[in-house]
Structure formats: C-alpha cells, structure tokens
C-alpha cells in the first residue's frame, strides 16, 4: 500500500515517487502495489477521478485531475469505483423513512439503542468495531481493525461526535446488527 500521495504536475516527479515505493516494496519481498490507501481500512483510500469542483468529505482525499492522468501513464488501473454523495434534506421525505422504519421494527423485532451521552455511545463501540470487521472482511484489501486501532479511534473520534448523530440497532436477542454515524 502507498498513501499520502502529493506531487506537482510533473510526470517525472510522480514516476520518481512511484519508483521509490516499488523499490521499498521489493526490499520487503512484496510483488504488487496498490494505492493511494492509508495504513488501515479506517484511513482515507482511493484517488479522486471525477467531481473536482466539489469539496471532499472528511474520509476522502482531494486530488487534482493530473494525479489520475499521471498514474494511468505509469500503468495503474482503476480497481474499484466509489461514489461519494450528498443528500439534501429539503428533498427527503421523513414520513416515508418513519413508515419504513416502523415496518422493519415490527417485522424483525429490532430496536434503536438509546445513546443520549458519549458514555452511553462508548458502551457500544466495541460491538460496533466487531460488526465493522465482520461486515467488511469479505472485501478485497480489507485490513481488520486491531484492538490497538480500536482504542485509538475511540479516543480520536467518539469524544467530538454528537451522540445524536450516532445510531445503533440491535436484534431481538440484543446483538448489535447495524450502526450509522
């Protein structure tokens, strides 16, 4: 994996950076490279390939169009595509969401876990990371979140997130089955 790619619009500079990454990889008996990707699956990943006129969200990088051009000229190919979208609240239909949520609650016996404080949120964060690891484990290039990383992310993100913006859903047996931040 390589990440944190930043360079001027000069193909020779990009080539020198990528060649250095390849050299380091060979020193460690690695036979392929992918990127840009962070150290873990919780870090930023990917290369912006469209939408250069929009502001990136907090979990994605912004790249100038020449990044894509340089990497293509150096033989890199797109492996996957992700779409980052914004939904305008004025276009939403809350009554439809409420009706759907109620139908799901009745049919499957799931319930929203009340977490009005950060302390209440923290009680569910370990189960959240367990679910995250289980859910994403089938994806190519996924690296499970270790206990040390889990502790780091708890300290880094949970204290500044408003508890009202974190939701947990549990099944009839009290097992966490869904979360949203």
Which residues are covered by each model-predicted region?
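Conserved beta-strand in the GNAT
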Residues: 1, 168, 175-181
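Acyl-donor binding region in acyl/amide transferases
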Residues: 1-75
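Active-site-proximal structural scaffolding
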Residues: 14, 60, 64, 78, ...
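Secondary-structure transition/capping motifs at alpha-helix termini
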Residues: 25-28, 160, 170-177
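A structural signal for short, well-ordered beta-strand segments and their strand-loop junctions
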Residues: 31-38, 79-86, 168
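Acyltransferase donor/substrate-recognition loop-hinge adjacent to the catalytic core
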Residues: 61-141, 178
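Conserved GNAT-fold acetyl-CoA-binding loop/helix
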Residues: 137-154
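A short helix-loop-beta-strand connector motif used in the catalytic cores of GNAT acetyltransferases and
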Residues: 155-167
């Amino acid at each position: 994996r390589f990440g944190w790619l930043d360079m001027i619009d000069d193909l020779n500079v990009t080539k020198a950076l990528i060649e250095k990454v390849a050299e380091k990889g060979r020193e460690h008996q690695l036979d392929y490279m992918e990127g840009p990707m962070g150290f873990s699956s919780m870090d930023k990943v990917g290369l912006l390939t469209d939408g250069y006129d929009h502001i990136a969200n907090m979990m994605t990088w912004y790249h100038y169009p020449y990044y894509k051009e340089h990497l293509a000229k150096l033989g890199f190919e797109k492996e996957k595509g992700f779409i980052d979208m914004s939904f305008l609240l004025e276009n939403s239909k809350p009554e439809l969401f409420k009706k759907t949520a109620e139908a799901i609650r009745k049919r499957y016996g799931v319930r929203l876990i009340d977490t009005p404080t950060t302390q209440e949120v923290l009680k569910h964060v370990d189960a959240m990371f367990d679910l995250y690891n289980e859910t994403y484990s089938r994806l190519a290039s996924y690296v499970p979140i270790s206990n040390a990383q889990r502790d780091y992310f708890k300290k880094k993100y949970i204290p500044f997130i408003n508890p009202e913006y974190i939701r947990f859903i549990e099944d009839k047996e009290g097992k966490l089955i869904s979360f949203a931040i």
